[in-house]
Amino acid sequence: MSRTLQLTEQLISLPSVTPEDAGCLELLADALQPMGFACERIDSGPDSFRVRNLWARRSGTGADRPVLVFAGHTDVVPTGPLEQWSSPPFVPTHRDGKLYGRGASDMKTSIAAFVVALEEFLAETPAPSFDIALLLTSDEEGPSVDGTKVVVELLRERGERLDWCIVGEPTSVERTGDMIKNGRRGTMSGRLTVKGIQGHIAYPQLARNPIHQALPALAELAATRWDEGNAFFPPTSWQISNMHGGTGASNVIPGHVTIDFNFRFCTESTAESLQQRVHAVLDHHGLEYELAWTIGGQPFLTTPGTLVNAVQAAIRAETGLETELSTTGGTSDGRFIAQICSQVVEVGPSNASIHKIDEHIVVADIEPIKNIYRRTLQELQRQQAV
């Protein structure tokens, strides 16, 4: 059994359902400290939702050394119905060339692969020309309030600079390394409450139906072309996720209706400009309303440069593939790290089974992931030596 597979299985066997860490960080710290990493625990959140975070850094001598950070999460989503699993989700199980277990793809394999890649890289290059750090959290699959976000805020307060970040999210589609994420769209949610006047449904002249009033405005928002996107991002999208109105009775005009919606926005728009345009539409339709906004993350983009080139070269050397740069999909903790790090790239194993019953990874894909990380480290070292 390879060292990477062994560490992956050890991590899967720890039932770290968000926000629980279940001992993952202790296991990883034990592997990192012999390599010279100073490990700092940065826990956050109330006792009822305590989040475990680890900041591990290996620093060299000399001023203004660049810093590479690997970001990952030890927490996993809930298992779902246990009876639907072919094998216990926290018992690593091999079947038909695949390793089954919750977190196999998202993202315990990536964490194990990077740690082993570090072991191999530092054995051959004990004094690299850049510092290396890991930022690991047990709050990525949950609210993401007390995890990476808190650590990034602390690093910013301390003036710690990050230059390159690899996020180990599962990004591959058909083959290992065929796609990496060099950016993500921003996300912003709104909760709109349109006010009316409740009344008997047989006497509409004595009431004001907020659903009827809201519909033209919602139709206009749904039809709006917010921007045209660009070479890296599709156009910004606006979608309604929930609508709640009425008392449950069939003869009552409701007094208010609440609409939840979400923007996924690209770098052609800002959160502020989108908010202004929404308010303009609502005001144009003469609605009496309240609107609360929640910004989940700003968009970020890493154009081809030092880190993207290193990852592409590593994938090419390991697999022969010319990887696709993509900004599709949901958000990740990269949105927080991008606030203090100008180059952020996500690269990891297949995302085909993430969050599903019988989550798994093809065993033959595990070593290539580790090798891609190791080759990226080697390529960054080569670039710094030039």
Curated annotation (Swiss-Prot):
Enzyme class: hydrolase
InterPro entries hit by this protein: Bact_exopeptidase_dim_dom, DapE_proteobac, Peptidase_M20, Peptidase_M20_dimer, Peptidase_M20A
Gene Ontology MF annotations: acetylornithine deacetylase activity; cobalt ion binding; succinyl-diaminopimelate desuccinylase activity; zinc ion binding
EC identifiers of the protein: 3.5.1.18
Cofactors, names only: Zn(2+); Co(2+)
Chain sites annotated for binding Zn(2+) 2: 106, 141, 355
Keywords: Amino-acid biosynthesis, Cobalt, Diaminopimelate biosynthesis, Hydrolase, Lysine biosynthesis, Metal-binding, Zinc
Top-level taxon of the source organism: Bacteria
Catalytic residues (UniProt): 75, 140 (proton acceptor)
GO biological process: diaminopimelate biosynthetic process; L-arginine biosynthetic process; lysine biosynthetic process via diaminopimelate
Species, as recorded: Delftia acidovorans (strain DSM 14801 / SPH-1)
CC cofactor note: Binds 2 Zn(2+) or Co(2+) ions per subunit.
Lineage of source species: Bacteria, Pseudomonadati, Pseudomonadota, Betaproteobacteria, Burkholderiales
Protein known as: Succinyl-diaminopimelate desuccinylase
Residues involved in Zn(2+) 1 binding: 73, 106, 169
Reaction catalysed by this enzyme: N-succinyl-(2S,6S)-2,6-diaminopimelate + H2O = (2S,6S)-2,6-diaminopimelate + succinate
Self-association state and partner proteins as the record states: Homodimer.
Coiled coil: none
Function of the molecule: Catalyzes the hydrolysis of N-succinyl-L,L-diaminopimelic acid (SDAP), forming succinate and LL-2,6-diaminopimelate (DAP), an intermediate involved in the bacterial biosynthesis of lysine and meso-diaminopimelic acid, an essential component of bacterial cell walls.
Pathway where it operates: Amino-acid biosynthesis; L-lysine biosynthesis via DAP pathway; LL-2,6-diaminopimelate from (S)-tetrahydrodipicolinate (succinylase route): step 3/3
SUPFAM superfamilies found in the cross-reference section: Bacterial exopeptidase dimerisation domain (SSF55031), Zn-dependent exopeptidases (SSF53187)
